Amino acid sequence: MPKDKDNDPRPRHVAIIMDGNGRWAKAQGRPRLFGHHEGARRVREIVESCPELGVKYLTIFAFSTENWKRTQVEVSGLMGLFKKYLLTEIKDLCDNGVRVRFIGDRQRLEPAIISLMNELEVITKDNSKLNLTIALNYGGRDEVFRATKRLAQDVADGKLHPAAINEETLPKYLDTLFLPDPDLVIRTSGEARVSGFLLWQSAYAEYEFIDTLWPDFTPDIFEHVLRNYCKRERRFGAVTP
C-alpha cells in the first residue's frame, strides 16, 4: 500500500473479530475444533503482514466471556489451543519484534494459561514493531463493569474525588488504557454485529463486515479491506466543509 509519511491514511490500530471457524470446519466435514486450529494458523499470517501494511496496533478477539456457554468439549479444546499457541509462538513473536499484551478478565482462566500470558507479556515488553493485543475471556460490558467497580473503589478509598470524574476518567480504568482507540474494526463470516467487542473504544471506529470466514482471511484480503478503509472520510461527528 502506498504511504504518504505526512498524511498516512492507513489505520494505525485495527481490531478484528475472528468469526467463522466453526462454520468453516463444518463446510469441510470436520469438527469445530479443527476450524479453530486453522484459525490460529491464520492469526500468524495476519500478524506477520501488519508491519508491511502500516498497522502498528492489532487487537484480536480470541475468546469472549459468553464463549463459556459453548460445549465443554469445545471450551476445553480452545483452552488447550490457547496454551499450545502461546507456547509455540513465543519465539516467532519475539523474533518478529511483536509486543504482546492481553485484555479481559483473567480470573476464570487456568493458572497455566495465566502464567503463559504473564510470561509472554514480560518477554516481549521491549518489542516495538507491532503491538498485538489478545482479548481473552473478554466482554465489552464486563470490561466497563470491572472498570466502574475499580473507579468506585478509588472514590470510596478517597483516592478520587467525585467532582474530578469526567469523560476521560473511565478509560484510565479500562483494560485498554495502554492502547489508542481502534481506527478500523473488522468482523469476518458475514455477521453484522459487534458482540460486545471494544464497546467504549470503538465509538468512532470504522467497521467492515466481510463474508469471508476467518480461516480463509488471507493477508491479501486484509490488504484489500485496508485499502477500502483508506477511501473513507472519518469525520468524528463533524460535518464535512
Task: Please report, for each region that a protein language model flagged, where it lies by residue.
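Flexible, compositionally biased loop and terminal segments
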Residues: M1-P241
